[in-house]
Amino acid sequence: MGKALMVQGTSSGAGKSLLVMALCRIFSNLGYDVVPFKSQNMSLNSAPSIEGGEISRAQYLQAVACRKKPSVRFNPILLKPEGNMRSQVVFMGKPIGSVSAREYMLSRKEELFRKAMKVLDELMVEHEIVIIEGAGSPVEINLKDYDIANMRVARHAKAKTILVTDIDRGGSFASIVGTMELLSKEERNLILGFVFNKFRGDASLLEPGFEYLEKRYGKPTLGVVPCIEHKLPEEDSLTSFPKVNGELHIQIVKLPHISNFTDFEPLHWANGVDYVTKAEEIEGDLIIIPGSKNTVEDLLWMRENGIEDAIIQAHHEGSFVVGICGGFQMLGEKIIDNVESKRGEVKGIGLLPAKTIFTPVKRTNHLKAEILWEPAKRMSVEGYEIRMGRSTSERPFSIIREINGAKAFEPEGALGERTFGTYLHGIFHNFAFTERLLNFLRAEKGLEPISVGGWSIEEEIERFARVVEKNLDVGYIISELGLG
């Protein structure tokens, strides 16, 4: 039977996901067979699994850190918010329905929790270490009785549990004390120690606080992890990408149901991006409509708020317009949706020669494609699709050459005049393509070409993990897990 190590936080945003990722890589580097696990995650940013299902981006990244192929078993329950206090429930990679928060808590949660724990038990039999991520805070008084992502999981797995806090926000010692006081005695006994995350300054100044915690709870501080600059995907925070005015003005429409906004991280690093929500803001050299959890509702939101007309006007005046997944569907001539919004036929923006019909079956695949857009013609790219729509166009953007490693020949996306749309999430992580697109636009403005890239997710994981390892008592953790 394998060992369970869990990371819980005093709040959302404490750094649980990246700390788990770092621990996954640290233990993998030490030669252990390690996998990640999160019983339930709520996220609009998902990724394809090896089984053809979808999991959260956080567990996908953690699997990469473990040097494992991402599996739905690492994130059995995924909740994807749809708006109006409803979420799509994805279990073991497949959608099983849409429910309100109350319906979910009262009807589905216990059944799914039992099934998720069966998956966890299997992982612990198959692997040496399972590193489990909690969610939010484990002691939210109004939610604790319904919580299936924190201490119920720790108790089930008898997991040694690290409690992490974001010291950069302030109040971290009070957050730890408050959390510990609200845990039961049984739950406090599972706490291995504390980690202070995102620290800036002289850690020796924190010593009196460490001594207080050890005296009061008999638990050590396991580490003080500094703020680490990185280019790793941030799971659900657009605030990680503040407005940056580069030499190109790149605008991304911040849709009410925006999803998979991690697509645009390379643009942020290469130039800077600006998320816009008002018609009067639309004027970029490059305007992008991103993916959406509710495509038709977001299209109608843009229409009602004048953003659609502003995009059309900007396009007429020379802006280049791109749509990714739901954004691609919106840019077409029409959408027939009797699945997601059930609004039937809806007129599209009309900048692309494409028509979309929604179907109940979701496509979730890794893809390799050949670009047909002239400035990058014949360039090979890879990414993934997570979609319920089927689109047709006489002018495809690319030809899919591989689907989950199997050879294919399938037209994808659409091309228009200074416009393209694609289902390829992650296309901008193909740095050669992004460089070609940005330099195409830069040349039009008389700007010198730039180089894009110089980093990779693998390198960023390794660099991040090394910093964490240097500032964490890994030896103590190994000893307490009985692995020494």
Swiss-Prot record:
SUPFAM superfamilies: Class I glutamine amidotransferase-like, P-loop containing nucleoside triphosphate hydrolases. Belongs to the CobB/CobQ family. CobQ subfamily. PROSITE patterns: GATASE_COBBQ. Transmembrane segments: none annotated. Residues 247-433 form the GATase cobBQ-type domain. Gene3D superfamilies: 3.40.50.880, P-loop containing nucleotide triphosphate hydrolases (3.40.50.300). GO terms for biological process: cobalamin biosynthetic process. The gene is cobQ. The keyword DNA-binding does not apply. This is Probable cobyric acid synthase. Pathway: Cofactor biosynthesis; adenosylcobalamin biosynthesis. GO terms for molecular function: ABC-type vitamin B12 transporter activity; catalytic activity.
